[in-house]
């Protein structure tokens, strides 16, 4: 069995963590370290530096870094059995008892207990970086690849890992590996949820010391931008801000070449290539690439809505939704497009709009190749492939792919319509619906197709129209493989498989799969036929029927088969015709399994099992399975030859 090394048992503090300890905790740390030294038996090297606190005060270095490095280095030449008298003992020197620090820096006047500590400190003034390492056979302390020199051997060893890419610290939960121990420690907190830094004023806790520092209530912002005057609490934030003026983007992705001004944005971007999702929900097991997405997801379980409007009391899951809502009270639209001058109530909406001018779409779907302007749009699109529906209605348990669809559905239970049109007084459940409605008053159509010039009031209609040019059909039925341009058409199609008929006639209780079918059916009871043909006077129940009828006068047949050239008046007849070429029979009888090309055919066939004959002759009482058979029978009474 391998002997235990000092690295295996030593406790490591960062400079920030050390600053949070009180005097009793620091004393306890020194006692523990002392006990650790005494229990190790295979070390072999006399220690020059016996001042733990001087080690800590070396700015930017670990609390015990010199101690660790020298102990670990000395093990290579040590012999087992040497006594522990060679261990450093912070209490054995006279200076330690008295607290005297006889070694003074001639540059800055700082005092040190030990000469070795003073020597190391002097290098910060002289810039000296010794090129020989005495304990390693006089080998130069230089890195061969870049000829970079270091003042301390432990820094040299750490730097080497940046070239060798050795990552000795691996997370047991997600497998992510790290070059250095401290980032590994910090990463582990993201899994454990540990937040060791607590604000004494408000009780808020933080994973990272830097976040804790930035949160401070002092109000001090010592770092001010000379160009715009904006001030910052921490230097890193100030540095990042300066890059917005200079345009500097020092962090470049090796896979796609995209550059970033901030390392956090760069690391986040890398996950789009690796697919890494380090944040996992304990309740449902769903994993996320970004901490912010993970936090937002947790609210779907807890129901927490931390953002509340002071005017109307409405609460929101997300800060962005809250900010957008607040503006509905004021009517302000402070964000203006630089190209066309259009104003928006949120910066995000403005940025999305600006991409319509430049055409930038950096996020591409790996399954179908479609690209998007925003990562959130890509994630939402991916659900059309996976069928994922993470949003569930608490009242009826219906699930949805998008949070917006859930919110829209929830209003069917509450009936709430908080958004009112100032011109006509009409109310809406959503601000987006109000915005679309307002365009009917001002005739605004901001979404224009670059291919044909057609303009649209609504971005969703515009996207659907674009598919008529590209031929894209992103919604695929898992049962029969049929694909659709619109999600609404896809959902309606699914009902042909499930048999779901949610729309019921109040007069005769007949049910329908589609609301449009119910509306058309209701006209049968009223007998009203409001759509009349101007040429022949024939009246129809539906506007779609009169449009088809008018084509019999004009001879227009807009739907042409690419295989045989045959043209059709209606899209439905065209689709039916296509099946004669493909042989597709998507409609199957649930009782005997027989398949049919047309839904009407399967309905008529099913009546052969049920015995239903809905078409009855008023003259003789004879009943028929299908309307076509019934019409043929009627002619026998009129004297027509069938």
Curated annotation (Swiss-Prot):
Gene3D superfamilies: 6.10.140.140, Classic Zinc Finger. One of its GO terms (biological process) is regulation of DNA-templated transcription. May be involved in transcriptional regulation. GO terms for molecular function: DNA binding; zinc ion binding. Belongs to the krueppel C2H2-type zinc-finger protein family. Keywords: DNA-binding, Metal-binding, Nucleus, Repeat, Transcription, Transcription regulation, Zinc, Zinc-finger. It is found in: Nucleus. The gene is ZNF14. Transmembrane segments: none annotated. A zinc finger (C2H2-type) spans 103-125, 141-163, 169-191, 197-217, 223-245, 251-273, 279-301, 307-329, 335-357, 363-385, 391-413, 419-441, 447-469, 475-497, 503-525, 531-553, 559-581, 587-609, 615-637. Residues 4-76 form the KRAB domain. This is Zinc finger protein 14.
